[in-house]
Amino acid sequence: MDYAALSPHLGGWALRDHHIGDSSLRGGAINWGNLGSRITSALNSTGRWLYNTGNRFVHSNTFNQIKQGIQDSGVIRNVANLAGETLGALTDIGRLKLQQDLEKLRRKALGEEGPATQAELQALIQALQAQVAAGEPPAAPAAPAPAPPLVPTTRPIPEMVTEVKPPVTSSAPAVPVDVPTTLEMRPPPPKRRRKRARPGQWRARLDSLSGTGVATATRRMCY
């Protein structure tokens, strides 16, 4: 196996051990880390220059003279007055258009003009809804009158009339109905718990293991 293929490369040229630790060990032809830091530094310096230039211009005499000239000329006041007059004119135009539509609808309802189209009615309804939303809420509509009772308008045909007969009752004896019954059974006796065989004393346990038990003897000796 060629272990040199695992070493760092600069393009197609492998870096040997005498290059490790110096500036040649960059991992490629372009140092991306250095490029990013340079771009960040350039952006920071550009923003700092723009901020300083704008700050100096705002605090300069030229800017103060321009601002004072605009205030003395009354341009801002004229623009505000013009905006207010334009808004008032638009409101008057909308009110006049609504009055004209109402007058036209009244004439058409009285028959003085042709019937109103569906588009005109829809536009008028939307205008009234907008006016009601801006002003007072509309009055509640009156309850509709009750409908008259339905009256048949045709006579019945004898051939199509069917006679209603009473239900037929049979004289046969009634069939007994099976009623389910339940048997009373005694509950099952409780289960007895079997006692587990427990060994007795330790001597009996030893007897079961060895078969002969442990022989003990007491002997008194004098010295």
Swiss-Prot record:
<keyword id="KW-1048">Host nucleus</keyword>
<feature type="site" description="Cleavage; by viral protease">
    <location>
        <begin position="28"/>
        <end position="29"/>
    </location>
</feature>
<keyword id="KW-1188">Viral release from host cell</keyword>
<keyword id="KW-0946">Virion</keyword>
<keyword id="KW-0832">Ubl conjugation</keyword>
<keyword id="KW-1174">Viral penetration via lysis of host organellar membrane</keyword>
<keyword id="KW-0945">Host-virus interaction</keyword>
<keyword id="KW-1035">Host cytoplasm</keyword>
<feature type="compositionally biased region" description="Basic residues">
    <location>
        <begin position="189"/>
        <end position="198"/>
    </location>
</feature>
<dbReference type="GO" id="GO:0019076">
    <property type="term" value="P:viral release from host cell"/>
</dbReference>
<feature type="region of interest" description="Interaction with hexon protein">
    <location>
        <begin position="47"/>
        <end position="73"/>
    </location>
</feature>
<feature type="compositionally biased region" description="Low complexity">
    <location>
        <begin position="166"/>
        <end position="182"/>
    </location>
</feature>
<feature type="region of interest" description="Interaction with hexon protein">
    <location>
        <begin position="206"/>
        <end position="212"/>
    </location>
</feature>
<feature type="region of interest" description="Disordered">
    <location>
        <begin position="166"/>
        <end position="203"/>
    </location>
</feature>
<feature type="compositionally biased region" description="Pro residues">
    <location>
        <begin position="138"/>
        <end position="151"/>
    </location>
</feature>
<dbReference type="GO" id="GO:0039664">
    <property type="term" value="P:lysis of host organelle involved in viral entry into host cell"/>
</dbReference>
<dbReference type="GO" id="GO:0043657">
    <property type="term" value="C:host cell"/>
</dbReference>
<keyword id="KW-1176">Cytoplasmic inwards viral transport</keyword>
<feature type="region of interest" description="Disordered">
    <location>
        <begin position="136"/>
        <end position="155"/>
    </location>
</feature>
<keyword id="KW-1015">Disulfide bond</keyword>
<feature type="region of interest" description="Involved in endosomal membrane lysis">
    <location>
        <begin position="31"/>
        <end position="52"/>
    </location>
</feature>
<keyword id="KW-0118">Viral capsid assembly</keyword>
<feature type="propeptide">
    <location>
        <begin position="1"/>
        <end position="28"/>
    </location>
</feature>
<comment type="similarity">
    <text>Belongs to the adenoviridae protein VI family.</text>
</comment>
<dbReference type="GO" id="GO:0030430">
    <property type="term" value="C:host cell cytoplasm"/>
</dbReference>
<keyword id="KW-1162">Viral penetration into host cytoplasm</keyword>
<dbReference type="GO" id="GO:0019028">
    <property type="term" value="C:viral capsid"/>
</dbReference>
<keyword id="KW-1160">Virus entry into host cell</keyword>
<dbReference type="GO" id="GO:0046729">
    <property type="term" value="C:viral procapsid"/>
</dbReference>
<keyword id="KW-1177">Microtubular inwards viral transport</keyword>
<keyword id="KW-0167">Capsid protein</keyword>
<dbReference type="GO" id="GO:0042025">
    <property type="term" value="C:host cell nucleus"/>
</dbReference>
<protein>
    <recommendedName>
        <fullName>Pre-protein VI</fullName>
    </recommendedName>
</protein>
<keyword id="KW-0426">Late protein</keyword>
<dbReference type="GO" id="GO:0075521">
    <property type="term" value="P:microtubule-dependent intracellular transport of viral material towards nucleus"/>
</dbReference>
<feature type="region of interest" description="Binds to importin alpha/beta, involved in hexon nuclear import">
    <location>
        <begin position="213"/>
        <end position="223"/>
    </location>
</feature>
<feature type="short sequence motif" description="Nuclear export signal">
    <location>
        <begin position="66"/>
        <end position="75"/>
    </location>
</feature>
<keyword id="KW-0597">Phosphoprotein</keyword>
<feature type="short sequence motif" description="Nuclear export signal">
    <location>
        <begin position="204"/>
        <end position="215"/>
    </location>
</feature>
<dbReference type="Pfam" id="PF02993">
    <property type="entry name" value="MCPVI"/>
</dbReference>
<feature type="region of interest" description="Amphipathic alpha-helix essential for membrane lytic activity">
    <location>
        <begin position="29"/>
        <end position="53"/>
    </location>
</feature>
<dbReference type="InterPro" id="IPR004243">
    <property type="entry name" value="McpVI"/>
</dbReference>
